[in-house]
Amino acid sequence: MTTPYPRSDERRRMVDLQIAGRGIRDPRVLAAMAEVPRHLFIPPPYDRDAYADTPLPIGNDQTISQPYIVALMTELLHPCPEDRVLEIGAGSGYQAAILARLAAKVVTIERLGAVAAQARANLAAVGAENVEVIEGDGTFGYPLSAPYDGILVTAASPEIPQPLTEQLADKGRLVVPVGGRAMQDIVVLERDGSRYREERIEGVRFVPLIGKYGWEN
């Protein structure tokens, strides 16, 4: 993903005003947000607003998160270049494309087949070759590639799904919105051997995480 994409000035303003301007400091996260073309992950006519700080529809009753939240959750995950990362809720693939620039391998799970197919196409279009898109119930995680140095959940769960904590590597981090259907808190869970430390960051509003260990459909 080294080719400069159109609308680079809009991305730079997005980063300066909406992301760095709101306290995101990790230079790798800022660089990834400035480089990945968000408009390619949003269908028309909504792509015209791709660099506004707002969630937008991507079809199938799903949304793409606002840029600030993508940057915040990525910074909280703190992926390193050698890391293996699991994302739950691929959506259109934008968050995975950001993670692909920051980690060695990204596995992203999407419940809806049509959405997963679009994510694959979008990720291929931006050359994110280190991302694998899996169709299935993300609340089970993906044991075949576990353990993960980082797990990022992009839908709201009533509680942290147990399979995800089990697939987290020692010293790994899990970032997930936890709460009711209307409002949640971003929770960061860190593993230290058999112990886990949990921190609540700030209030958010995400679509529900549907699955065995999430919400019923």
UniProtKB/Swiss-Prot annotation:
Indicate yes or no for the key word Cell cycle: no
**Reactions accelerated catalytically:** [protein]-L-isoaspartate + S-adenosyl-L-methionine = [protein]-L-isoaspartate alpha-methyl ester + S-adenosyl-L-homocysteine
What class does this enzyme belong to in the EC scheme? transferase
Any one Gene Ontology BP term: protein modification process
EC code(s) of this entry:
2.1.1.77
GO molecular function of the protein, one example? protein-L-isoaspartate (D-aspartate) O-methyltransferase activity
Keywords in alphabetical order, please: Cytoplasm, Methyltransferase, S-adenosyl-L-methionine, Transferase
Kindly give the PROSITE patterns that the UniProt entry links to this protein.
PCMT (PS01279)
Can you tell me which residues form the catalytic site? S65
Pfam families documented for this protein: PCMT
State the compartments where it is located: Cytoplasm
Cellular compartments per GO CC: cytoplasm
Q: Which family does it belong to?
A: Belongs to the methyltransferase superfamily. L-isoaspartyl/D-aspartyl protein methyltransferase family.
- Described purpose of this protein according to its UniProt entry: Catalyzes the methyl esterification of L-isoaspartyl residues in peptides and proteins that result from spontaneous decomposition of normal L-aspartyl and L-asparaginyl residues. It plays a role in the repair and/or degradation of damaged proteins.
Record protein name field:
Protein-L-isoaspartate O-methyltransferase
Q: Name the species this protein comes from.
A: Methanoregula boonei (strain DSM 21154 / JCM 14090 / 6A8)
